[in-house]
Amino acid sequence: MLKVIQLDKTYGSNKHSLKAVNFTAKPGEVTAIIGPSGAGKTTILRSINQLIRDDSGQILLDDTDIRQANKAELRKVRHHIGMIFQNYNLISPLTALENVLHGRLGAKSTVAGMLGLYSSAEKQEALQLLDEVGLKEYAYQRCDQLSGGQQQRVGIARALMQHPKMILCDEPIASLDPKSTTIVMDILRRLAKEKQLIILINLHQVDIAMAYTDHIVGINSGAIVFEGATNEVDDAVLQHIYRQPDQSTAVAANEN
C-alpha cells in the first residue's frame, strides 16, 4: 500500500504547491488524482518517486519511507516504481523490444546496462509483456514507426519489466485518440487486478476517471479536498474539486 502523509512542498516565496497532502492507494486498484490544471497533480507523482524533493511529510510504500531513503536505497525503491509518461519517454530509434528491456536497467550493473547485455530469459519476458499489451507482432519494429497509442503500450510493458509494486502514470492518455485511450485504460485496469499493482494516475478527463478507476483523490490549489471510492463521486463533489479558489470550501476531504 502507498500512504502519503502530511506531504508539503513550497516553491519560491513560500508558494505552496502541496499543502499537508494525505491519501492512500491500494494494490489491485486504479487510483486517479483529479483536479484543475496547476492544482499539484504532477507534483505529487514526482514527489512520490523523488524526482523532485518535497519539504516535509512521509511517503510510505509498504513500510519504506521513500523520503528517508539514501541514494542507494532510493535506487532500489525506484526499481519497484514504474513510470508512464504523457510523451511516452521511449528511445525512438530502438525497437519496441529494446525499449521494454530497458526496464531492467535498474537491476543491472552500469557496464551491463551500457552494453545492453540481457539474458535470454529477460528477452523472453519482454516478448511476453509485449504480448500482454497486444504488441508482440511489433516487437522488432522501431518505436518511431508506431502510433501514439502503441508507443504508450510499449511504455506500459517497459514499466512492467521492472517488476514494480506501483506504476505512476502522469497524464498517460492526454495525447491519445478515443480508441487508444480505451485500450490503454483497459490494460491499466486489468494489470492492477491481475498483478495486484498500485496504479496511480493523473487525469484531466473526469469521464475516464469515473469509468476506469476504483478510487478518486481530488486536489485543488495543492490541498486534498476529496478522497473516496469512485462511486461516491457525484456532481457536488466534482464542483467542490474544480471550484475556483475564492469559492466555498465547505466540503471536507473524505477519510476513506
Swiss-Prot record:
Q: Which GO terms describe its molecular function?
A: ABC-type phosphonate transporter activity; ATP binding; ATP hydrolysis activity
Pfam families, from UniProt? ABC_tran
Binding residues annotated for ATP, in chain numbering: 35-42
Keyword match Transport: yes
Q: Which domain of life is it from?
A: Bacteria
Q: Which GO terms describe its cellular component?
A: plasma membrane
Which InterPro entries does the annotation name?
AAA+_ATPase (IPR003593), ABC_transporter-like_ATP-bd (IPR003439), ABC_transporter-like_CS (IPR017871), ABC_transpr_PhnC (IPR012693), MetN_ABC_transporter-like (IPR050086), P-loop_NTPase (IPR027417)
EC no. given is 7.3.2.2
The top EC class is translocase
Q: Which reaction does it catalyse?
A: phosphonate(out) + ATP + H2O = phosphonate(in) + ADP + phosphate + H(+)
Domain (ABC transporter) spans 2-246
Instruction: Spell out the SUPFAM superfamilies in the cross-references.
Output: P-loop containing nucleoside triphosphate hydrolases
Enumerate the CDD domains for this protein: ABC_PhnC_transporter (cd03256)
Task: Say which family it is in.
Answer: Belongs to the ABC transporter superfamily. Phosphonates importer (TC 3.A.1.9.1) family.
The subunit field of the Swiss-Prot or TrEMBL record says: The complex is composed of two ATP-binding proteins (PhnC), two transmembrane proteins (PhnE) and a solute-binding protein (PhnD).
Put simply, this protein is called Phosphonates import ATP-binding protein PhnC
Organism of origin is Lactiplantibacillus plantarum (strain ATCC BAA-793 / NCIMB 8826 / WCFS1)
